[in-house]
């Protein structure tokens, strides 16, 4: 089941400026980037210590102003398939688990107000472990 909070995700207008703030102003470590097939960066992970992270994704100015910058909370789970099965048995709608570009398993649920919650299971190859 749930073992902790893995990360909090924010949409930012300027990814470079955000990385500078977290890394150079707060003294946190920029761990890895999310990149498109063409190599362009669209997001990153900032380590807060241990396996706790801030996840940043760049978004257009209109989207950031139109909606809050907070995107979701992510709960670390020990066994993604088992957790998804248990949640479904409890009547929770849950997406099928998939392996993300960070080599970690993820599935998605929502609370009654529609707030997105990511379920996240690390693998031996998870980029978060390389920090």
Predicted feature locations:
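Vicinal oxygen chelate
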Residues: 1, 84-131
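N-terminal beta-strand motif that seeds the catalytic metal site of vicinal oxygen chelate
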Residues: 1-17, 70-73, 125-131
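Core segments of cupin and vicinal oxygen chelate
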Residues: 9-51
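A short beta-turn/loop motif at secondary-structure boundaries
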Residues: 36-38, 63-64, 99-101
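Exposed loop/turn and edge beta-strand positions of beta-sandwich/beta-sheet ligand-binding modules
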Residues: 40-42, 69, 103
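Mid-chain, well-packed structural core segment of small domains
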Residues: 66, 73-84
